[in-house]
């Protein structure tokens, strides 16, 4: 049976179909918004997974190129690994859904969102969050409540819900708000230095717009939703819990109140070892329960410390930033480096400048086709003092890199202002919370050190939240460290400049957070950001006047677009010859902009000279210094500009009669010639005789 329900959201139809497709999935839906369609399938294992201490949720966001009428490139002509954008979209869906499953739920759950049709005016990533929530609500899988997502744009101080492609180009804000009926669940934002008050208002606007989609989901559940399963939830053995608490409660409290991180961790390890020695034999098959009890005891102590004792694990005030350190110019051969330290968190970012042609080409369903500014983030095991295999970037690393990239993107100069491709790599050297925002600070240092004329320096900070069990008490924390992140309820990352916010990313372990938290976190983040920006300014107050000696020197010239073929030549013969002879990189745009790059400045000058010669028009009456390239019985061919030759007839070689061309010139000679005529076929006639006569007349006038 096919169940169909539709509603109007921001002037467009949102529709869900349930029961027609994917009959063997727990729930499968087609959900559309305009002509963008997401196929969502959700399934769960019948029994909990044994021996784990986490909820095994898997969210997959699958892009199909047929959705935009494309055939994949490459030899095999099929989709390969998910793109970075697909990974980021999958993470956004995951972060929105995860807190809404029951605590202690250990069944494997998989949510697969497949993008099957895309209309550029309606973003599939926004629809995917709504589609995933709808499918879970309609399924029998335990899921607390509907959650909705909208995108908010800002044009001329007016908020726009789910802006179309044209509006997204004009908008200075790109905000995604996910919310339940009562609380905000997740926030993603990028903006052109948006003032705090406007950002808060935009989030409230997005929350209100989410309510229509939540009502739509609730209506669908009433009409054709499945009855929910009663799950088997993980609970700790009561006897284990009682014994461990009686034995270790005082020791845990004493250890957690140690302010030094290393000493605290050592004390906790000692408690764990004592517990193992005391109860290892008695509860040899209950190590999972013991681990859970110890975790809950530590969490309770930290939360009591923050909410009741009003003190933080390291002794700081709630709005205090850890000690800061900034340094630039660490590495001798790189184009720019920045070392940023905040407490025990330390990130080194390296900037590399490349030619315009070094841009990243994107092959996917996204509107963007290329990127000239990119940020990569590496988080090795040694950053937390652990031994781990070094593999490629995981989802978390891709997500943190994209977040830092988004924070600086509005501040990067245009290609016209700064004709370089820019790559940043952040190496996390030490991690004790908020490495993504430390990467923003390190990136600012590296870009300024590299001579990139940023609009303004940027900095980032991570805010946290601790709440009581009944949510009656809330405490926002500035610059959270690892222990506060681990045992806390929220990670609220804010980056920006002195003028406003450039990026936000928020996720929570709760079933949402209040607007009071949003306002306090954003306003406290600004205070912290100003402190960090002052420290950055003390280290380096403006971009270097020149790029590094080891960076490519790029110069731009403008040529007539009709002359581009003259520079490229048949099959690229001419441009490849220039590149080979001068050692430069040449990139040509359709509008006639030519970018010439090389670490050898002389090579750049030589290449530009050749290109200007190739595109310069030969004019009758002008005098050129040319090189003899060929001799015949009737004259000499002379190259006056690159790839442009003319004929000096034997009668035009000298003032006197010439019997043999070789008597006057030889191949390779440089001579001054005058253009006497360009005939209808474009052939150039030259005269050395006219130049000599002009010189003679000039000398005679000077003698008089």
Swiss-Prot record:
Molecular function as annotated in GO: 3'-5'-RNA exonuclease activity; magnesium ion binding; polyribonucleotide nucleotidyltransferase activity; RNA binding
Record bears the keyword S-adenosyl-L-methionine: no
CDD domains: KH-I_PNPase (cd02393), RNase_PH_PNPase_1 (cd11363), RNase_PH_PNPase_2 (cd11364), S1_PNPase (cd04472)
Principal location: cytoplasm
EC class (word): transferase
Domain KH: 552-611
Residues holding Mg(2+): 485, 491
Cofactors (names): Mg(2+)
Catalytic activity field: RNA(n+1) + phosphate = RNA(n) + a ribonucleoside 5'-diphosphate
Keywords per UniProt: Cytoplasm, Magnesium, Metal-binding, Nucleotidyltransferase, RNA-binding, Transferase
Coiled coil regions in record: none
GO cellular component labels: cytosol
Annotated localization: Cytoplasm
Any GO BP: RNA processing
Function: Involved in mRNA degradation. Catalyzes the phosphorolysis of single-stranded polyribonucleotides processively in the 3'- to 5'-direction.
Family matches, as PANTHER family: POLYRIBONUCLEOTIDE NUCLEOTIDYLTRANSFERASE (PTHR11252), POLYRIBONUCLEOTIDE NUCLEOTIDYLTRANSFERASE 1, MITOCHONDRIAL (PTHR11252:SF0)
The protein's name: Polyribonucleotide nucleotidyltransferase
Source organism of this protein record: Clostridium botulinum (strain Alaska E43 / Type E3)
Gene of this entry: pnp
